[in-house]
Amino acid sequence: MCIRDRYYTWNEIIKNDICDAMKAYGHEVKLLSYEIKSYIKDIEFLNIVENELNNGRNCGKPYDFIFSCNFMPVISKIALRNKIPYVSWTYDSPCMTMYSEMIYNPYNFMFHFDSSEVERIRKSGVKHIYHLPLAVNVRRTDAQIRACADNVSPALINKGVAFMGNLYNNEPDFVESVAGLPDYEKGYINGIKLAQLTMPGSELLEEMFDDALCDRLKKYVSFSKEEEFFVKDTDMILNMLKKNISSMERIGILRELSEVCDVTLYTQSSGCDMRGVRVREYIDYERDMPVMFANSAINLNVTLRNIRTGIPLRALDIMGAGGFLLTNYCPELNEYMTEGKDFVSYIDAGDCCEKAVYYIEHEAERKKIAANGHDRILDMFTYEHQIKKMFDVIRKEL
């Protein structure tokens, strides 16, 4: 029996890879691309989806699932109204829609790449929430890399360190954006941010930023939230501060690296000129990114602070392309792979610089680690592997 999926896409970068894996798993996949006006309530979108669901039932080809990347409350409501399972795979953090009361919908089957988020949501009483790391379409990336092996663009070749990502330098600084914030609170928060930078493996920010501090800040700042969202103001402030810290961390590491080796930054961020850092435009995720990772000596990952335990997609992309990964400490990466064998992690900026220089100079060791990382992705983190795990879980629950 053919399983029919209605896949809502917002043109996320992993759309095609997920579709290919679902089809390989024997599913018939029909995409729906639509610009949702509100992730909470969109009558036009609801009517479009429900008409298609009804048409499928009327012609004897009902849909078995609705699917989306990231959890969408408006889709969950459609699933509840039509009593059809809604499968979501969240790969963003923070994903604020996971604070919607619709996470309690019994027709949801929610998968999340970060086990700490799964635990948080499960503790709130949600049953159908599961941990599922992200994936790489290794078949596609390997073919792309082989196809252009003899004709790689110079813009995709790096003999030193390459970093592809957002610097978040255009995000508002929380402390400076709050009008009238007293100097004491400014100094306290800035002190926490600086202390967190010097203690990369800790959760100092969350330990020191308590509800009492948040209550004091409420005198100067307020947040607009949907009624059905139960996110605390403390969590919203923490998410903003974590982005600020991530920006400081990424810029700081790139600056220190530029003093000891060649550094190339691929980014959409504006106003990020740094002495010694070659800045290039963001490159296409499917076409150019795997080729760049495969042709860079060192590929740097600096995880966004909002990700507590999960393996960032970028880290998997690097290893899946056969690139050498140098990353900050990532709990789940260490659960699935071996540090120093499949990838290399650093403790702080100084350690990052030392290891970057070492592995630039020791090509054989670097290539061996990169090859091991690629093999681990092939063994455990392909889309075919993860999609099978996803629907094996769902089959047991239905």
Language-model segments: residues:
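Active-site proximal beta-strand in glycosyltransferases
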Residues: 79-94, 109-112, 134, 162
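Structural motif
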Residues: 64-65, 85, 109, 298, ...
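Catalytic binding pocket for nucleotide-activated donors in carbohydrate/polymer assembly enzymes
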Residues: 4-9, 13-25, 30-37, 103-104, ...
